[in-house]
Amino acid sequence: MSTDKQYYDSILANLANFDSYYNSKVTRKKRANEHPLDDGIRQKLADLIVTGKENELFEKLSMVQEIWISLIKKSIICLRYYDTREPFLQNRSKTPLAYGTDSLLDYFKKYTDFESLLYGGANHYRDHVVHVFRVWLLGIDILLRNNCQYLDKIKIDQYCLINPLEKLSVWTLISLSHDLGYPLEKSLQIVEKTRDMMKNFVTNPIMNMDIDFSGVQNNMNDFVLRFMSSKMHKKDGEHDLYVARLQPKYYFKFQKSLEHNTHGIISSLIIYKLLIFFMESDYSLHEDYTFDKEDVRQYYIRREILRAIASHTCPDVYQLNMCNMSYLLILCDESQDWGRKSLTNLYVDDNVKYTFKDVDIDMGSTPFVCKVQDSYNISGGDVEQSILRILKRFLGQSKTYRILFRDGQDTAKRDFDFHRIVEIEPTNSKRFEVDLKITTNAQAQIVVTQTRGRFSENDAFNKAFKAVFPGCEVDPAAKTLKVSIESE
């Protein structure tokens, strides 16, 4: 059974609990007809994930596109429905529409067509069309597990109380839109490689495909960056009125991200400019521009979507809380690795079987504990080189997590411990577990445990391990090896 089918079956098993949870939170008169888990979406999912074949989604790419835009539309419709400034809650004869989604779908189709070029343009480029759907699927499963425990606890801001369907809609827009800017970012790298190649026969080749903005475009981008980088404060002397204040750290970090053309910030700009839902946002930093409670709530909903998307490629923004959308996107985006092949993988005999095990979240402990687990089974071939590739990739991921979950101002308040666990089985007689531990009360470290067999001086694992961690010796008598690493 494919990983996609496993997660779909898990979601299916939890839908009844979700329905009960949702019904307990929202009265019958206020239940939206359209949302990301309505009957129409449930039927589309049932038609999409049927056989359990590993490549089923790639064989049904047109259906993936169809459900992608349906989910986007239903999410916007749901969010508009619960906006009390609009007429839909009071007048059920009126139905909200998702304006701008035709333009977004047109962009997404071009994105899909263009992706085939990117496979040949970068050795390590991997699918991002099916990927975003899988990220959504994994996130939905996490939100619905254990009687919707994570869905219940996830929040946006103290001034932004949202119901379960609004939370699902926010997650849907974040997960399905977070990589829209990827082709633009990658195209620049392809141009750089072409320019470098041309230097062999052309002196100072002139090729320019920088994403330059000028005039009004710069002003528009700056407005969106300020929108993402602000928060609301109660106006002095006014009980129910608020004013917006810029958060300079966020603003500078997102400016830096845009300067480097990272696809997260570009994706945020794309959806803000294409979807009327965002263009209708109320926002100003002027002191005399005030917001009431619903204005504030709607501002935070939109800011959460844009900020989460921008933050997932902005390592300068570190994470303090597990129960927010930004954390969930990073978790699901980094974890979704099943079924993704790069150009390099397609032309190399693969003696390594990869299995994604799960994302396990324990919300019953203090602090919360999050574990991302997968495994590699190596059969034949150059075992040492296979282990070396796995460990190098693990080290790269570890660096990403250590930066995102690094210590900084207010990190004493961090409410979670994080584990990234990889199980490596090079032969039938040996098995090793490599665990990146980032905890609230200790320095980050990597712990290697032999779960079957013994360490030995000349085996493939020891050689690969010493190549990745120079100076670290494996003690054959030990069952566990700890490697201290500095948070970056």
Regions found by a protein language model. Give the residues of each.
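Broad hydrophobic/π-residue packing in well-ordered secondary structure
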Residues: G121, R126-V129, P183-E185, I270, ...
